[in-house]
Amino acid sequence: MTLLIIIAALFALVLINVPIAVAIGTVGVVGVVIFMGVDALVNVPLTLFNGATKFPLIAIPLFILAGALMNTSGISMRLINLVTAMVGFVRGGLAMVNVGVSMFFAEISGSAVADVAATGSVLIPEMKKRKYTPQFSAAITSSSASLAIIIPPSLSMILYGAIADTSIVKLFVAGIIPGILGGLGLAMLCYYYARKYDMPREAAFSLSTLGKAFREAFWALTLPVIILGGIFGGFVTATEGAGIAVLAALVIGGLIYRELNLQVLYRAVIDGVIQTSVVMLLVATSAVLGLFLTEMQLPQQLAQEITAITTDPVAVLALLNILLLLLGMFLHGAAAIILVVPIVMPLIQQIGIDPIHFGLILTLNLAIGQQTPPVASVLATSCSIAKTDMWETTKVNLPMIFVLFLVLMLVTYVPAIPMSLVEHFYG
């Protein structure tokens, strides 16, 4: 009953437009006072500090800054030109370019919002010029950008790994196959729509154009190789890889492409600071809520109540998917992770689900939730760029959401899909 009151209070505050971080912190502090006493407030400042200073979380601002640098230093534009030269000649090619570029960008930024801002600001206006509807342009940009929280290095996985005390590198490896499946599914859907609605082609395929685009994008292509190669090869941790991503983006954008001056760098840093502040404030205030939840042993109570109904992993995963989809529809991805992970981890451990497997289930649910109103943070960003109504765009976006849902079902009930590479490399 207490857990239901907490969730109801959070949703009530969010629905009256209280910032999510403030809502979580308020519920946490009130819970501490009511159930632990006023004297327990002395623990709140230290809990706030400790919650936001876990070492793995250092990767979050660094990857956010790397994404901002990519967006302002010509790196993302060169990736767009390369993918256009590769698949633009296919009917509906610009939509497929959108998917491909989002997957490339995801391998560096790890953020769906950064992805949609970088790719959407360039591709959505181009798609509208070529007679793609604003709704379709916004929908495919949003759906493909959501792959950024599945494809490594995902900020959502870093956050989950830090909270669940799970290997972030293994989470990254587990996200490779689901991310590719999601991208292929969206590309196939684009091809189907292109044939059905006679969508335009770009210029005819040209080997010389492809060669030129590849030469210009070569250094941009080295970024994911450096970052992911270093992490997967065991040469660096995810946090160190994030630092290398920033350094590489600075060198490539500033010294090689020469598009990164002090003014551009200042703008990128400011954008990065704003995005980081949002995430880290959520992390800090959620630690206070976690203090209250732990003291009340609410996660353990939830595990006992669900296992009293069923211990069948199939049924439990179905219930968790419903819960996660609903949370993803109303909460920012980071807020949903911070809220749900401490609550459900005892249940996950009790029924024998691998935390890595559950991490992929969680992030896929959030990818779908980011596309689904009423909040739909990524879809809303895409619609603002396309200047189109979010509810009208949602109608067009439903088949793309269905593609992501199919990937979710495969990952949920065929654990080998996310876990095969993990077991191959780490035993």
Could you say what each language-model-derived stretch is?
Residues 1-427:
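Alpha-helical transmembrane segments of multi-pass membrane transport proteins
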